Amino acid sequence: MSELKTGHAGHNPWASVANSGPISILSYCGSSILMTVTNKFVVNLKDFNMNFVMLFVQSLVCTITLIILRILGYAKFRSLNKTDAKNWFPISFLLVLMIYTSSKALQYLAVPIYTIFKNLTIILIAYGEVLFFGGSVTSMELSSFLLMVLSSVVATWGDQQAVAAKAASLAEGAAGAVASFNPGYFWMFTNCITSALFVLIMRKRIKLTNFKDFDTMFYNNVLALPILLLFSFCVEDWSSVNLTNNFSNDSLTAMIISGVASVGISYCSGWCVRVTSSTTYSMVGALNKLPIALSGLIFFDAPRNFLSILSIFIGFLSGIIYAVAKQKKQQAQPLRK
């Protein structure tokens, strides 16, 4: 069992908060926005090329934070044991693949392009729920998915306009380099698949193992540590020169901040999946790209044009339609649960 220490055992005011769908969604939104922005900052630092190390720091911070909370009596979760570790290891492995491919995609792609494939993940997860959990997708929900994809396509057109304008201002050789294949598409395609598998399989394993939020957070991160370190030693450059370039004061500070942000996203992602559904979790993740797009205008010099702004409005419209569709579905099935 895992829980947050809340005081007396009688009526627990925190119980309603811990099982609140809207609060879990808002918490997940805030933490995931902070996580994405800090990750984008880290991977865009000059000469930074040790993504696995960055992700290792994040998981290490999460693990240490949980252990401290447990010592202080504010958190309870299952101790690491062989049976649970064996059952949960595939989830942690998928988590490593998901967060690594996400960091590589953010490194090479603009946020609007990144959003397109995240929206495709929503559809994969929605129909994955149909296959694995007996769920259903209404025509109204499908309409919201299509609108979300449309908002991403419109954002991409805006991004392409900006790229074309930039290429036109460059010399012919540089323009050719701009037009060359972007490896970010490969990373995004891989991230799309691993994200869908992670969310669907984690939800199933949570039901089978009866993991609570802190259990999920602890096992996700502590099992990811050796995987991340092994991958880093295998594929990343650990020479003294490269370590010096990667571990500057700016990069270390940014990695610590991103590690703190990962504490929130690690807890809130499991919390959101438990009290809502994996489709709602993924849709909220896609809606996060809207404020992230706005932060990109401020921090990351994202394209500023009519199409970029239009995509934001279409995205919010799709979110409203999705919320109404979910409400109608619940009203049509009042006796379930």
Curated annotation (Swiss-Prot):
Principal location class: Golgi
InterPro entries: SCL35B1-4/HUT1 (IPR013657), TPT_transporter (IPR050186)
Chain ranges on the Lumenal side, renumbered to this chain: 38-51, 114-119, 166-180, 237-252, 301-304
Span list, region RET2-binding: 326-337
Effect listed in the UniProt record for changing residue 291 to A: Decreases transport activity and GDP-mannose-binding
Glycosylated position list: 119, 242, 246, 249
GO terms of biological process kind: GDP-mannose transmembrane transport
Effect of residue 289 to A/D: Decreases transport activity and GDP-mannose-binding
Residue stretches spanning the membrane: 17-37, 52-72, 93-113, 120-140, 145-165, 181-201, 216-236, 253-273, 280-300, 305-325
GO cellular component terms given for this protein: cytoplasmic vesicle membrane; endoplasmic reticulum membrane; Golgi apparatus; Golgi membrane; mitochondrion
Record's keyword terms, sorted: Cytoplasmic vesicle, Endoplasmic reticulum, Glycoprotein, Golgi apparatus, Membrane, Sugar transport, Transmembrane, Transmembrane helix, Transport
GO molecular function, one term: antiporter activity
Cytoplasmic compartment spans: 1-16, 73-92, 141-144, 202-215, 274-279, 326-337
Function: Involved in the import of GDP-mannose from the cytoplasm into the Golgi lumen. Defective copy causes severe glycosylation defect and abnormal retention of soluble endoplasmic reticulum proteins. Involved in vanadate sensitivity.
NCBIfam families hit by this protein: nst (TIGR00803)
Subunit structure: Homooligomer.
Full protein name: GDP-mannose transporter 1
Taxonomic placement: Eukaryota, Fungi, Dikarya, Ascomycota, Saccharomycotina
